[in-house]
Design a protein with these regions (language model features):
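A conserved short coil-to-beta-strand element within the FAD-binding core of flavoproteins
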Residues: 230-244
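Conserved N-terminal/central alpha/beta ligand/cofactor-binding core
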Residues: 37-227, 276-285
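Glycine-rich, N-terminal phosphate-binding loop of Rossmann-like dinucleotide-binding domains
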Residues: 14, 56, 268-269
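Loop/turn elements at helix/coil->beta-strand transitions in domains of secreted/extracellular proteins
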Residues: 7, 28-31, 224-225, 261
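N-terminal Rossmann-like FAD-binding beta1-loop-alpha1 element of flavoenzymes
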Residues: 9-34
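Glycine-rich loop(s) and the adjacent beta-strand/alpha-helix scaffold that form part
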Residues: 204-211, 223, 252-304
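Extreme N-terminal leader/targeting segments of oxidoreductases
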Residues: 1-9, 27, 211, 215
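A structured beta-alpha segment of the ubiquitous adenosine-cofactor-binding alpha/beta core
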Residues: 80-85, 248-257
């Protein structure tokens, strides 16, 4: 006998998009469930650099008061070329700064400015500072028992599991450790602290970048009482009269039908680990080429 559960909104996927959706829906008074196929939450976000490009954010306005909406729009028009979508760009520029303010006001998600320029700062409308922000560093002990379910960061962007804070002088101290006594002392203290964390928790607990963003979003969702079902892959969507009404999940070895009264949100990523689909999208693979992606192996295009 299949188990059946009802909610208002079912979110499939636990990266930044899925968790942000779940938090927003829960804040609106809706009953939300987040289902994640892998045993850890955070998705590709937890592996990523976690940089948000948000022209006009509160942090950006303080960092570069000369920047403005019109310049950001001109930059996007130049970068997008024939793919420029005026309605989508205007919606983004109008609402993205308010999104940042809302999350900082309503949740434990906090951001910090960065020194990153636009990808092409000399292009029309481009700037060399003020549009990119990062989640503030986070101590994952605040997740309590759920700390073990946060996807660890990508190993290649850590040093023996230690993450770096690119929004301050952290990295500079490591680069200057052989040249400056102050930097050498800073690095020694960081290493000792990190080794203690490894001994106690078997992982670094001071996280940055995308791992901090995923952790802060997860903490906010959990504090709101949103269930984060890990190890619960969606097998199929449930439809009635041509409309999606829920999804069939595998959870704890059982089939669970989750019926959503308002919406099913597919926030389960792309298909970098579906070789057949990649082969159809990139014909040159037939000639011997191959794409390798560092994203989690669970990204197989389930929602496409």
């Amino acid at each position: 006998m299949n188990e059946s559960i009802e909610c208002d909104v079912l979110v499939i996927g636990s990266g930044a998009g899925g968790l942000a959706t779940a938090i927003t829906a829960r804040k609106a008074g809706l009953d939300v469930i987040v289902a994640e196929k892998e045993p850890v939450f955070g998705g590709t976000t937890a592996f990523s650099g976690g940089v948000l490009w948000i022209p006009g954010s509160p942090h950006g306005r303080r960092q570069n008061a000369a920047d403005n909406r019109e310049a950001a729009r001109e930059y996007l028009r130049h970068e997008c070329g024939a793919f420029f979508d005026a309605a989508a760009v205007d919606a983004f520029l109008d609402h993205a700064p308010a999104m940042v303010e809302w999350f900082e006001r309503e949740t434990c998600v906090k951001f910090v400015p960065t020194l990153y320029p636009d990808y092409h700062p000399t292009a029309p409308g481009g700037v060399d500072i003020g549009r990119s922000i990062l989640a503030a560093p986070f101590d994952i002990r605040e997740l309590g028992a759920d700390m073990a379910r946060l996807r660890p960061p990508l190993a290649t962007i850590t040093f023996i599991g230690m993450m770096f804070n690119s929004s301050n002088a952290d990295l500079k101290h490591f680069f200057n450790a052989a040249k400056s006594l102050a930097s050498a002392w800073y690095v020694c203290k960081r290493l000792v602290t990190h080794l203690k964390e490894l001994a106690l928790y078997r992982r670094g607990i001071q996280v940055t970048s995308g791992n901090a963003l995923a952790a802060r979003l997860a903490k906010s969702a959990l504090d709101l009482g949103v269930p984060l079902w890990t190890g619960s892959p969606a097998r199929r969507l449930v439809t009635e009269r041509g409309a999606v009404r829920g999804a069939e999940l595998q959870r704890d070895g059982k089939t669970v039908i989750v019926r959503a009264r308002h919406a099913v949100v597919l926030a389960c990523g792309g298909f970098p680990h579906d070789r057949a689909r990649i082969g159809r999208a990139y014909p040159h693979l037939a000639r011997g080429g191959e794409h390798h992606s560092p994203v989690p192996e669970g990204n197989t295009g389930d929602g496409i």
